[in-house]
Regions:
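Residues that define the transmembrane beta-barrel architecture of outer-membrane proteins
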Residues: 54-56, 73-77, 125-129, 156-160, ...
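Transmembrane beta-barrel strands of outer-membrane/channel proteins
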Residues: 62-64, 92-96, 145-149, 176-180, ...
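Outer-membrane beta-barrel translocator domains and adjoining extracellular loop/strand segments
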Residues: 72, 103-111, 117, 124, ...
Length: 282
């Protein structure tokens, strides 16, 4: 038996396998290029992915007690929830405070610098609820539109809301919303936060929120322009991802007319509070 035919046969098989591998690679490159040019919906259809499934989530990002070192304390919350599909969702947000004790009116104001009648009494201070339609416009950003209703002492207000939220570069969560009220008033709110993982369970979260108003509203202790800036840092321990106690510090600075109105009411242009609470979601 001569070895040459066997070697030739092996070489022929190797060449066939190499050609087949090249063809598979070319097909994969073509598919990848086609998918890169597809829209998200076309890609989902091509890959036979079901993008009509409905799902939801509720998160209390801040559910805490704050103490500024005086006779008054306050419970505060910042929560949101959504339900819908991959592209469109119903999105609900709420935030506010429940004040106890008898500190002065200006110190009983919320992060927007607002105070209502009887602000020295216990009760809800300037809570609000937003009901929004959420639409995905990119892998990182959503556009939102809907309405906001304010609650608490004094005259309540109804606002139309349009905004955008998502992940900015370096994984900062960012949110910007503009409002117009049924009385022609305008406002804007900017928020940003970032999760810095110290360990797999210990997370440091810086947070910032700024509120701006188109015109003064003395009844709610609001001046025009930049009304206030809240900056806080919270350190949480994730017992589970969905359950994390935390401690933190919250600093609020009022500006311009809002600071003047706070001083006129006997308060300060800034507050510094310690916070302890829970971050939960389900």
């Amino acid at each position: 038996m001569r070895p040459m035919p066997a070697i030739a046969t092996l070489l022929a098989i190797a060449m066939l396998l190499a050609n087949a591998a090249d063809a598979v690679a070319e097909d994969a490159d073509t598919v990848a290029q086609d998918q890169h040019a597809m829209s998200y919906r076309e890609m989902a259809d091509t890959m036979q992915m079901d993008d009509t499934t409905r799902f939801g989530k509720v998160m209390f990002d801040q559910l805490e007690w704050r103490d500024g070192g005086a006779d008054e304390g306050r419970a505060a919350w910042d929560a949101q929830g959504y339900y819908g599909g991959d592209y469109d969702k119903l999105w609900i947000k709420t935030e506010g405070k429940y004040v106890t004790g008898s500190r002065d009116a200006a110190s009983a104001s919320d992060a927007g610098g607002r105070v209502g009648a009887g602000a020295g009494d216990s009760g809800i201070r300037d809570a609000n609820v937003e009901v929004l339609w959420n639409r995905v416009i990119s892998p990182w950003w959503n556009v939102q539109a809907g309405g906001r209703q304010d609650f608490g002492p004094g005259q309540s207000r109804t606002w139309a809301a349009v905004g955008i939220q998502g992940l900015a570069p370096q994984w900062f969560e960012a949110e910007a919303t503009v409002y117009t009220s049924d009385e022609g008033r305008t406002a804007a709110r900017l928020k940003s936060q970032y999760d810095l993982l110290l360990t797999q369970r210990l997370v440091l979260q810086p947070f910032a929120e700024a509120n701006l108003y188109g015109r003064s509203d003395p009844a709610h202790q609001i001046g025009s322009g930049l009304a206030d800036l809240e900056v806080s840092v919270r350190l949480r321990y994730e017992v589970r991802r969905e359950f994390a106690p935390y401690v933190g510090i919250v600093w609020l600075r009022r500006f311009g007319g809002t600071a003047d109105l706070a001083r006129a009411a006997g308060g300060d242009a800034h507050d510094l509070e310690l916070a302890a609470g829970l971050r939960v979601w389900f």
